[in-house]
């Protein structure tokens, strides 16, 4: 596939997961999210010309399929719609060929973001990357293509709406008349995220590179229960399932406040409902479960939280993550692997739910299996998904193996099923009754404390501090609901805080104590939270290169090496420029995730490595870094007296 004519129009990129995908592509990665692919049946006897005609109509209907994604002169995401695309229909025969065809990455900056093939029996293989469409948008493509093929076979006009909404128009609206809503949303989340529990799970030592434990439950009982509760509660099935999942997590992990990201499609307006685009974004959703609420009360609280959050979902995704990153640095708590919940429950209305039907009678027909994976898109610390197939509810969980084992993961999906089933059978479910359904819930040990709505392993934090080469002794304690770290070291609080937040804990959460009490070798005692950071000059070639790249890409005057990329004023859409400037100066080794994290520039410089450069047919190395040890008592720039001055601020043209 290739573009065969010039550009028809250009515009910014609409807000959604597509922005994160764009950022990955711009920095050389093959995208953050899986590529969508379907085999679409071609009606028997339909000619190749007719199939090509259906595909032509699909490409003309949806501009996004004729779009390349690159950056404008300011480095911002841009989509350019081409007049036509040269379409190829290669034969895809056999499982290996199909896998290669569907998994080969796209070059979305220079080639069409869609791929068509034909199977041995003549069916169409359709492949699109996530930057083109989320699951809802991709399904629109499949249904439109199916209808266009049927119309060709039946020699009639396709039964599609006259006009399809286009992403460029949505993006222009967001950048112009919709900007006020964007700003309001960002202000809301800047405040709300301050109180967002950093993780569902206990905060303890994670394993970088750990597998993901998967549990897949197929339940006719839960399908009937969901249909029954939908009728009796007159409530959206997605809300019902989400309430059950929150209840199950609260019981399983001994929590009374939970925050998850609800994958939410920005399709509430007629202008976006039928749009093929990547419009999904995460809705941060905090639900308070204090007072041991019944299932119906959890549902009520959840619906209220959704209403509040839903009023503030018009944010720009990259700007949202910038705001969130600054909040994380301020709070001293960071979750590298998201914790998300997703519901796709179309077809629930066809599940029979007659009064008197007892879903408990179907529990014996449930089937659960566990497995493990470790793919590039296994980024979540927790991912819960619910969907319907022929009246059976499928509940899938994917959890970092540092947190749970196979039995625990299976127990979570079974508990969610049980809560739905027993709530449907009884009309409601008391919290104590829901607790009795759990077979092996987690409970804290002696050195665990509840702080800021999460359980924290004090020994984990103590041991992590002791891993710093300049720390002689450390002890983390809970004092009046806050964490205090007593440390013997010639360091400043911000250095210890930065060490904790920059240490690789896999997908699991990291956090810093609220207060440090540091006993120095000169007998002086230094105390503080480590939130305030000094103006710190670069030392060595790597630090200087990183500072110059950050400042040059973002037009910053003098960013402190003690600050994080986002707190010194770095912008996410300019990360590709930062990395390019680093390469030009002879360094590599960090990526988007590093610059999004609450890690200081000085710590990030420690991850840089020399690039191997070819000169005259021989390999030479870029300038080496002067030192690679962790930060151990850095000096501040002149004028920062105590080292604690805070930062401000184929074939056919279509």
Regions found by a protein language model. Give the residues of each.
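His-Asp-centered acyl/peptidyl-transfer active-site segments
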Residues: 3-4, 26-35, 52, 63-64, ...
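A short, small/polar-residue-rich loop/turn motif at beta-strand boundaries
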Residues: 2-3, 43-60, 76-111, 224, ...
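Small-residue-rich loop/turn and linker elements
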Residues: 26-31, 59-98, 115-120, 152-181, ...
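Extended, hydrophobic beta-loop-alpha segments that form or line the acyl/peptidyl-thioester binding
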Residues: 62, 66, 142, 256-263, ...
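Gly/Ser/Thr-rich phosphate-binding loops and adjoining beta-strand/alpha-helix segments
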Residues: 5, 30-50, 109-127, 205-269, ...
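A short N-terminal helical cap/helix-turn-helix that marks the beginning
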Residues: 68-69, 145, 149-165, 190-199, ...
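Short amphipathic alpha-helices and their capping loops
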Residues: 1-28, 52-95, 164-212, 610-654
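Acyl-group handoff/entry surfaces in thioester-processing enzymes
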Residues: 2-80, 93-176, 308-319
């Amino acid at each position: 596939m290739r573009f065969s004519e010039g550009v028809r129009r250009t515009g910014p990129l609409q807000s959604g997961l597509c922005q994160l995908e764009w950022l990955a592509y711009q920095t050389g990665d093959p995208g953050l999210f899986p590529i969508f692919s379907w085999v679409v049946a071609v009606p028997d006897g339909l000619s190749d010309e007719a199939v090509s005609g259906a595909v032509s109509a699909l490409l003309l209907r949806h501009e996004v399929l004729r779009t390349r994604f690159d950056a404008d002169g300011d480095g911002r995401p841009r989509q350019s719609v081409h007049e036509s695309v040269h379409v190829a229909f290669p034969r895809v025969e056999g499982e290996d060929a199909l896998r290669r065809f569907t998994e080969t990455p796209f070059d979305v900056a220079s080639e069409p973001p869609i791929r068509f093939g034909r199977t041995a029996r003549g069916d169409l293989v359709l492949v699109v990357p996530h930057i083109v469409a989320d699951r809802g948008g991709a399904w629109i493509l499949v249904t439109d293509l199916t209808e266009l093929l049927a119309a060709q076979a039946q020699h009639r006009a396709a039964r599609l709406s006259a006009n399809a909404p286009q992403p460029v128009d949505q993006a222009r609206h967001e950048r112009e008349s919709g900007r006020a809503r964007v700003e309001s949303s960002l202000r809301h989340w800047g405040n709300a995220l301050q109180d967002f529990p950093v993780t569902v799970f206990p905060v303890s030592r994670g394993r970088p590179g750990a597998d993901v434990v998967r549990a897949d439950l197929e339940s006719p009982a839960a399908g009937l229960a969901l249909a029954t509760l939908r009728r009796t509660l007159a409530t959206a099935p997605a809300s019902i399932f989400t309430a059950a999942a929150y209840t199950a997590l609260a019981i399983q992990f001994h929590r009374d406040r939970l925050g998850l990201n609800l994958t939410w499609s920005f399709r509430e307006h007629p202008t976006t409902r039928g749009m093929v685009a990547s419009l999904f974004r995460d809705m941060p959703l905090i639900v308070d479960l204090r007072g041991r609420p019944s299932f119906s009360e959890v549902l009520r609280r959840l619906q209220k939280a959704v209403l509040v959050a839903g009023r503030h979902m018009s944010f720009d995704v990259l700007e949202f993550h910038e705001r969130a990153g600054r909040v994380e640095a301020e709070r001293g708590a960071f979750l590298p692997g998201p914790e998300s919940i997703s519901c796709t429950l179309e077809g629930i209305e066809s599940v029979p739910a007659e009064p008197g039907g007892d879903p408990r009678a179907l529990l014996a027909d449930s089937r659960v299996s566990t497995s493990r994976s470790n793919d590039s898109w296994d980024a979540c610390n927790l991912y819960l998904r619910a969907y319907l197939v022929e009246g059976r509810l499928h509940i899938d969980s994917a959890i970092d193996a540092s947190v749970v084992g196979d039995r625990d993961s299976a127990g979570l999906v079974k508990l969610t099923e049980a809560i739905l089933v027993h709530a449907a059978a009884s009309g409601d479910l008391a919290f104590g009754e829901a607790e009795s359904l759990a077979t092996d819930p987690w409970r804290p040990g002696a050195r665990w404390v509840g702080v800021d709505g999460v359980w924290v392993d004090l020994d984990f934090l103590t041991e992590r501090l002791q891993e710093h080469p300049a720390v002689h002794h450390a002890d983390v304690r809970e004092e009046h609901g806050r964490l205090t770290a007593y440390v013997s070291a010639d360091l400043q609080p911000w250095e210890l805080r930065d060490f904790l937040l920059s240490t690789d804990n896999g997908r699991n959460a990291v956090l810093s104590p609220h207060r440090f009490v540091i006993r120095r070798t000169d007998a002086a005692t230094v105390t503080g939270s480590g939130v305030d950071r000094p103006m710190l000059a670069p030392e060595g070639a790597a630090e200087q290169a990183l500072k110059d790249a950050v400042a040059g890409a973002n037009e910053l005057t003098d960013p402190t090496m003690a600050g994080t990329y986002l707190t010194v004023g770095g912008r996410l859409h300019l990360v590709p420029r930062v990395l390019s400037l680093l390469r030009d100066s002879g360094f590599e080794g960090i990526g988007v995730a590093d610059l999004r994290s609450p890690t200081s520039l000085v710590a990030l410089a420690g991850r840089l490595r020399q690039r191997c450069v070819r000169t005259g047919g021989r390999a030479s190395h870029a300038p080496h870094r002067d030192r690679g040890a962790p930060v151990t008592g850095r000096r501040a720039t002149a004028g920062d007296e105590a080292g604690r001055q805070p930062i401000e601020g184929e074939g056919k043209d279509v």
